């Protein structure tokens, strides 16, 4: 289902953004 694929990709991107924000807070 393309909708589920989009959701997983979106959640992956959101997780990536949160990780980058976390790394920026460490630096």
Swiss-Prot record:
Question: Its Gene Ontology molecular function terms?
Answer: digestive hormone activity; hormone activity
Q: Which InterPro entries match?
A: Glucagon_GIP_secretin_VIP (IPR000532)
- Give the chief site where it resides: secreted
Transmembrane ranges, per UniProt, are none
Biological processes, Gene Ontology terms? adenylate cyclase-activating G protein-coupled receptor signaling pathway; diet induced thermogenesis; hippocampus development; intracellular water homeostasis; positive regulation of lipid catabolic process; regulation of appetite; regulation of synaptic plasticity; response to nutrient levels
Any idea which residues bear Methionine amide here?
Answer: 27
Q: Where in the cell is it found?
A: Secreted
Q: Which UniProt keywords apply?
A: Amidation, Hormone, Secreted
Source organism, top-level taxon: Eukaryota
- GO CC list: extracellular space
**Has keyword Secreted?**
yes
Q: Could you tell me what this protein does? A: Hormone involved in different processes, such as regulation of the pH of the duodenal content, food intake and water homeostasis. Exerts its biological effects by binding to secretin receptor (SCTR), a G-protein coupled receptor expressed in the basolateral domain of several cells.
Family statement: Belongs to the glucagon family.
The name under which this protein is listed is: Secretin
Q: Which gene is this protein's source?
A: SCT
């Amino acid at each position: 289902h393309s909708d589920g694929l989009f959701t997983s990709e979106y959640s992956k991107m959101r997780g990536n953004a949160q990780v980058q924000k976390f790394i920026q807070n460490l630096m």
